[in-house]
């Protein structure tokens, strides 16, 4: 098991060294919030009902109201007694997120900025594809990993999200899709924050949305990404889930990676690759390497050759991502011609590779951008 306290201290120290400024630490205590009803797995809700003098079969009825009928008040749960509805309302929140901004791109992408009960804001993105509707969820308010090209780390980490706050992002998006008779078919845990830094809440979220009585989203339609918290990769591999797994790599050698990603100082590239090999061997599943291309930093043909050598023999796929412009960062997006040259080199070396389709650029849909814009406007 990971010593979370030591890990927190280690990453905070490394990010402070890399950024030369203090990192805002997450609150150690849980915020004083009303617990979301969406935090429960069915058996957990059954236990709560029994402890409060109610029949456990009511859990299935409550789940039906939450995930099939998608009610917005406890009063709408008409097959429950008034007494039970009152108990639920007294103990839980049915809505912990309120919509601050909802923007729709010309390509159909919808970006949501939600406000939490304690006033913090988070982002969620609905992306439309030929194969269905994908939701990118956030797992933390801010991020402390400190990647030097990312908008999510601006302002540091405020707190971890609770499982119900992550689930409710998907529910809110589904309520929007209900208006056009569509459904959420895919989930990517690639929004603001490091999912493996909020591991328990992430796992609870996965079990709720994957459950047949929950949102019933198939495991193979869910992808979780990490910046490279090595001990958690081993733990995730041992879970033996059918969920897709991605690693934010962004560089093929230790020196370049730790410049872009301070976490590489805590967990060296060779340690990360060893953990990835363990994952593929343990699960039999491939890993996706997320690779953000930045002009003059990590996009040369020579670096593509180095990347090919690094991952050769691993059951994997490379997802090339042209980085988005972030005003507070100095990196420049790689040219289209260089992106294609990089892709061609990987393919020549037998690497399975795709270029991520850009979506929602006209509404700041990249991770952390809308939240950063809102924070900037608030401080003017």
Curated annotation (Swiss-Prot):
Disulfide bonds join 136-367. SUPFAM superfamilies: Radical SAM enzymes (SSF102114). Residues 129-362 form the Radical SAM core domain. InterPro entries: Aldolase_TIM (IPR013785), Methyltransferase_A (IPR040072), RlmN_N (IPR048641), RNA_MTrfase_RlmN (IPR027492), rRNA_lsu_MTrfase_RlmN/Cfr (IPR004383), rSAM (IPR007197). It is found in: Cytoplasm. The keyword 4Fe-4S applies. It catalyses: adenosine(2503) in 23S rRNA + 2 reduced [2Fe-2S]-[ferredoxin] + 2 S-adenosyl-L-methionine = 2-methyladenosine(2503) in 23S rRNA + 5'-deoxyadenosine + L-methionine + 2 oxidized [2Fe-2S]-[ferredoxin] + S-adenosyl-L-homocysteine; adenosine(37) in tRNA + 2 reduced [2Fe-2S]-[ferredoxin] + 2 S-adenosyl-L-methionine = 2-methyladenosine(37) in tRNA + 5'-deoxyadenosine + L-methionine + 2 oxidized [2Fe-2S]-[ferredoxin] + S-adenosyl-L-homocysteine. Binds 1 [4Fe-4S] cluster. The cluster is coordinated with 3 cysteines and an exchangeable S-adenosyl-L-methionine. The keyword Cell cycle does not apply. GO terms for cellular component: cytoplasm. Its EC number is 2.1.1.192. [4Fe-4S] cluster binds at residues 143, 147, 150. PROSITE patterns: RADICAL_SAM. GO terms for biological process: rRNA base methylation; tRNA methylation. Its cofactor is [4Fe-4S] cluster. The active site is at 123 (proton acceptor), 367 (s-methylcysteine intermediate). GO terms for molecular function: 4 iron, 4 sulfur cluster binding; metal ion binding; rRNA (adenine(2503)-C2-)-methyltransferase activity; rRNA binding; tRNA (adenine(37)-C2)-methyltransferase activity; tRNA binding. S-adenosyl-L-methionine binds at residues 193-194, 225, 248-250, 324. It comes from the Bacteria. Keywords: 4Fe-4S, Cytoplasm, Disulfide bond, Iron, Iron-sulfur, Metal-binding, Methyltransferase, rRNA processing, S-adenosyl-L-methionine, Transferase, tRNA processing. Pfam families: Radical_SAM, RlmN_N. It is an enzyme of class 2 (transferase). Specifically methylates position 2 of adenine 2503 in 23S rRNA and position 2 of adenine 37 in tRNAs. Belongs to the radical SAM superfamily. RlmN family. Reaction proceeds by a ping-pong mechanism involving intermediate methylation of a conserved cysteine residue. This is Probable dual-specificity RNA methyltransferase RlmN.
